[in-house]
């Protein structure tokens, strides 16, 4: 039987079974899990089994490995990610039988329709900000439903059905699908040149789409915008909705001062209109995470969450999988090396993480293992990648993760190595296979180093492999 939290109208009355094509994806599995918890029958297919599909199976989802037309038999609706096209046999079969096929964001919008939706948009910082909001709301006793693009460490999942009317979710601009959402509160963390193929290579079109997204808010809704970002500041006058700004800038409505970082923990003071200054700390390094915390504080304050709960929720935040996740210590001659895994795959994200490391551990060397994500992104942001990757002390580059793209001449990791080497910043090392990394990197490591594995592709599997590798006799740690 389908059930809804108190005060939430039941939706999708004619729908019983929901089939997800590409159910293992970060944006898909969370929605599937919430629907399972609501009592819907859920099935889904993916190209390979994973911890995600196994988890959904334990919760009652029927999982198919591979895409076959018959997988969708009995479904009342198909949910597809932007990576799935009409030629997919399950989609083609559903269309032939006049079964509705909807994008992932439309299903998320349906979940949000009768809830108090809080949607977090922006090129960078969506997952962490969404996670922080969910954590602070939970600390305030509001028990939100959340759908996040990464695993919330405290909950062990990237989605959860709460008992309240609140739903907190990421709003994805990569395919402009966030335009389906009609939240009560919307955050814009920043706007950067990424996923430009969606916008025909036109940055102005991207900016206009963010403006359109914010105007999906009702006239009594709230836009929460980071004025430290120049593009967000630029579109601010176009937003005809109630707005609160945040940042480090002196003209921000809510701002952070007295910022101090030691290792993983960051302390700062929050200034809010008509409120006493609030001293907070968060167990994450970097100014970018101060900004993510400020967005959370704006929304929590607006929803009436107590300062005590805000401080508790931020201080006790246990992080998100692959967002500066500390795996533990690798044993090397003379001591150990801190092993960190991170999802950052845009030059601005890479720069923010490097800055956080330099700020929290100024005496340590940074040994970086990086995998570019998509040939098009590598091509479009090539000079930015050359500049930022050259800031490591030691750099190992894995081949580009294609994400379904064909190689582009001159936009690969070998060429990046060549360009960085030519500038005399350092001498990068190129490698192709996961198994090559441990013997390559071990002689390069010194006691006290930080080893950062970063990128959005299969580089995400390297840190778990290294911490178990007998070459290092590693002692595992908890994700940060």
Curated annotation (Swiss-Prot):
One Pfam family this sequence matches: Mur_ligase_C
Pathway it works in: Cell wall biogenesis; peptidoglycan biosynthesis
Segments traversing the membrane: none
GO terms for cellular component: cytoplasm
Alphabetized GO MF terms: ATP binding; UDP-N-acetylmuramate-L-alanine ligase activity
GO biological process: cell division; cell wall organization; peptidoglycan biosynthetic process; regulation of cell shape
Main location: cytoplasm
EC number(s) stated in the UniProt entry for this protein: 6.3.2.8
Reactions that this protein is recorded to catalyse: UDP-N-acetyl-alpha-D-muramate + L-alanine + ATP = UDP-N-acetyl-alpha-D-muramoyl-L-alanine + ADP + phosphate + H(+)
S-S pairs: none
Localisation per UniProt entry: Cytoplasm
Binding site for ATP: 122-128
Domain of life: Bacteria
Keywords: ATP-binding, Cell cycle, Cell division, Cell shape, Cell wall biogenesis/degradation, Cytoplasm, Ligase, Nucleotide-binding, Peptidoglycan synthesis
Matching HAMAP family: MurC
Purpose: Cell wall formation.
Name this protein carries in UniProt: UDP-N-acetylmuramate--L-alanine ligase
Source organism: Pseudomonas paraeruginosa (strain DSM 24068 / PA7)
Protein encoded by which gene: murC
């Amino acid at each position: 039987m389908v059930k809804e939290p108190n005060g939430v109208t039941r939706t999708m009355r004619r729908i019983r079974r929901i089939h997800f094509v590409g159910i293992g994806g970060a944006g898909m599995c969370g929605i599937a899990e919430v629907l399972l918890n609501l009592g819907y029958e859920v099935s889904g297919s993916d190209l390979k089994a994973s911890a995600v599909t196994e988890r959904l199976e334990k919760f009652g989802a029927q999982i198919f490995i591979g895409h076959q037309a018959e997988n969708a038999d009995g479904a009342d609706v198909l949910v597809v990610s932007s990576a799935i096209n009409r030629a997919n046999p399950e989609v083609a079969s559903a269309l032939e039988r006049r079964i509705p096929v909807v994008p992932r964001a439309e299903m998320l919008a349906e979940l949000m329709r009768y809830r108090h939706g809080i949607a977090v948009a922006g090129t960078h910082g969506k997952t962490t900000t969404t996670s922080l909001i969910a954590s602070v709301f939970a600390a305030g006793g509001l028990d939100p439903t959340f759908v996040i693009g990464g695993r919330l460490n405290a909950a062990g999942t990237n989605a959860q059905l709460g008992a309240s009317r609140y739903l907190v979710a990421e709003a994805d601009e990569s395919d402009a699908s966030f335009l389906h959402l009609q939240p009560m509160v919307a955050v814009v963390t920043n706007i950067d040149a990424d996923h430009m193929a969606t916008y025909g290579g036109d940055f102005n079109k991207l900016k206009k789409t963010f403006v359109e997204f914010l105007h999906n808010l009702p006239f009594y809704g709230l836009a929460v915008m980071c004025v430290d970002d120049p593009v967000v500041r630029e579109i601010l006058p176009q937003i005809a909705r109630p707005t609160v700004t945040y940042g480090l800038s002196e003209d921000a409505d809510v701002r952070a001062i007295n910022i101090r970082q030691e290792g993983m923990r960051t302390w700062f003071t929050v200034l809010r209109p008509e409120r006493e200054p609030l001293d907070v700390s968060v167990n994450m390094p970097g100014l970018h995470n101060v900004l993510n915390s400020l967005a959370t504080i704006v929304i929590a304050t607006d929803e009436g969450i107590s300062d005590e709960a805000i401080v508790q929720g931020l201080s006790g935040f246990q992080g998100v999988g692959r967002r500066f996740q500390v795996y533990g210590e690798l044993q090397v001659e003379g001591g150990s090396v801190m092993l960190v895994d991170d999802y950052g795959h845009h030059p601005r994200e890479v720069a923010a993480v490097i800055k956080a490391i330099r700020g929290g551990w100024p005496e340590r060397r940074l040994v970086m293992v990086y995998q570019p994500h998509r040939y098009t992104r590598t091509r479009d942001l090539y000079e930015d990648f050359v500049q930022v990757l050259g800031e490591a002390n030691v750099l190992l580059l894995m081949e580009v993760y294609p994400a379904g793209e064909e190689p582009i001449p001159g936009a690969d990791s070998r060429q990046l190595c060549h360009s960085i080497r030519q500038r005399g910043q350092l001498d990068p090392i190129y490698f192709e296979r996961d198994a090559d990394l441990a013997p390559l990197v071990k002689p390069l490591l010194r006691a006290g180093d930080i080893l950062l594995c970063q990128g959005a592709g299969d580089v995400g599997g390297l840190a778990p492999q290294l911490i178990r590798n007998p070459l290092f006799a590693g002692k595992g740690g908890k994700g940060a």
